[in-house]
Amino acid sequence: RGPKNWCKVHPCWTTCGSQMRQSPININTNQTIYKRYPRLKVENVHKRVIATIRNNGHAPYFEVHEKFDDEIVLRNVPERPRRKEYNFAQLHVQLGRDEKEGSEHSIDNKFKPMEAQMVFYDKDYEDVLEAKSKKNGLVVISVMIEVYGRSKEHDDCACDGETCTVRYVRKLSKLMEKYYEKVRRYPLVSINPHFLTFIKLPRKCWYNKCGRTPSPDFIEKKCEKEEPETRPFFVFEGITPLDVIPYDTNRFYTYAGSLTSPPCYETVQWVVFKCPIKVSSKAFRMLQLVQDSHLDPLEKLGVRRPLQTNKNVIVYRNHLK
């Protein structure tokens, strides 16, 4: 049915039909509001944490396996209380059907081939699964990705009249090349029977709830454990946000949005870095070849959600134009 009809597919996904703060969006820089924020701070960012990689049928993603002394913790999140801390949990890389327009967000209607999304969750919760439905439970740091050798631009690209030095992220390239090959096939292990029960229900039961978020009680009992289980592969090298972040981490845009895949909960503070990074063409190709839940390569349809139109989303920037 496609992203436009996600809210009609499953009763846990009704938030996908909201028009309040759904993601992704086009960031119109002329309409952003300047606001000073303290610098983002990441504790233990130089540590490589234990991780696995899975293919959930939508896209492959790296998942952190935490130990108490190895948590990578994000602080000074814009528009969130200063005391709040968020644990690094996942790394996703999105791409589209069009090789040049694979990022989910756009800046002044310009896309990049891919977009890296680092997911952090509020430490008040046990894990990302519990936090993602909770108010202000998640923070996602987004970095646009170019492909080495495919861009006509030089390493220095003009961004809003200023220059970004584009970092070639060698370690991320190697991780993508190696581990996207391992999860190329879609390896479904099991599926929660609750999910199949909902699919068999007459859809009119929840059609009229499109745009409304399910109750906390419903989410806890019916939604939090319904995702299919898939085979994990151990990432021997581990991961760190340093694999992904651009040279310039001082300039970003931020807004209150949502998850970009079902259940689309509106619980995310997005931080979109102004400057991109660059990965190898082989890394890009390995991602394109990963299978989705229909056993088609991701390059056929892509995994990016279309831009969303919201009623009142304010985008802030922490830098002068």
UniProtKB/Swiss-Prot annotation:
Gene3D superfamilies (UniProt xref): Alpha carbonic anhydrase
Matching SUPFAM superfamilies: Carbonic anhydrase (SSF51069)
Cross-referenced SMART domains: Carb_anhydrase
Gene Ontology molecular function terms on file: carbonate dehydratase activity; zinc ion binding
Tissue: Component of the organic matrix of calcified shell layers like nacre and prisms.
Cleavable signal peptide: none
Keywords tagged on the record: Secreted
Keyword flag Repeat: no
Domain Alpha-carbonic anhydrase: 1-319
A GO CC term attached to the entry: extracellular region
Localization, UniProt: Secreted
Biological processes per GO annotation: one-carbon metabolic process
Covalent S-S links between cysteines: none
List of catalytic residues: H58
UniProt entry tagged with the keyword Cell membrane: no
Main localization of the protein described in the UniProt heading: secreted
Family the entry assigns: Belongs to the alpha-carbonic anhydrase family.
Stated name of the protein: Nacrein-like protein
Originating organism: Mytilus californianus (California mussel)
